[in-house]
Each structure stands twice: as structure tokens, then as C-alpha cells.
């Protein structure tokens, strides 16, 4: 069986944590920021985790991560 290919777009966007979960950046932080409060923008700087529902899909995209 041939090697599985890593989805390069996904590999650039996700990192694996020590416990094996996938870390991601939050959306809505690139433009149209004037109407968002400082608190909202500050919270968007923090990283998020991939939901359990999406983790199965991500494991297929990132077999070696």
C-alpha cells in the first residue's frame, strides 16, 4: 500500500498538542475589526482546539502529524 499524503493546507494550519489534540487559530481576526471590541479581539488572539466531531476528519488529512 502506498504512503498516505498529508494535506499540506491543513498541515500549515494545525499543530498537535502534547495530549494529542489539534490546536488551531481562531477565525474572524483578519479584517473588519473596527466594529469588534477590544475584548473580542483579545480573545480571538488565543488558540482554540478542534472539536471532537472534526477530529476524525482531520486525522485522515494529517496521517503523520
UniProtKB/Swiss-Prot annotation:
Name the InterPro entries for this protein.
Ribosomal_bL35 (IPR001706), Ribosomal_bL35-like (IPR021137), Ribosomal_bL35_CS (IPR018265), Ribosomal_bL35_sf (IPR037229)
SUPFAM superfamilies (UniProt xref) = L35p-like (SSF143034)
**Coiled coil segments of this chain:** none
Q: Name one GO molecular function term.
A: structural constituent of ribosome
Q: Which Pfam families match?
A: Ribosomal_L35p
| Gene3D superfamilies referenced in this protein's UniProt entry, alphabetically | 4.10.410.60
Q: Which UniProt keywords apply?
A: Ribonucleoprotein, Ribosomal protein
State the residue spans of region: Disordered.
1-26
GO cellular component labels: cytosolic large ribosomal subunit
GO biological process terms, semicolon-separated: translation
Under the heading PROSITE patterns, the entry gives: RIBOSOMAL_L35
SS bond partners: none
Please, which domain of life does this record's source organism belong to? Bacteria
Family statement drawn from the similarity comment of this UniProt entry:
Belongs to the bacterial ribosomal protein bL35 family.
HAMAP family in alphabetical order: Ribosomal_bL35
Q: Know the name of this protein? A: Large ribosomal subunit protein bL35
Organism listed in the record: Clostridium novyi (strain NT)
Amino acid at each position: 500500500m502506498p504512503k498516505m499524503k498529508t494535506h499540506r493546507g491543513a498541515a500549515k494550519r494545525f499543530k498537535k498538542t502534547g495530549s494529542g489534540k489539534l490546536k488551531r487559530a481562531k477565525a474572524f481576526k483578519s479584517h473588519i475589526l473596527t466594529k469588534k471590541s477590544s475584548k473580542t479581539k483579545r480573545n480571538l488572539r488565543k488558540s482554540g482546539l478542534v472539536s471532537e466531531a472534526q477530529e476524525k476528519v482531520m486525522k485522515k488529512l494529517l496521517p503523520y502529524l
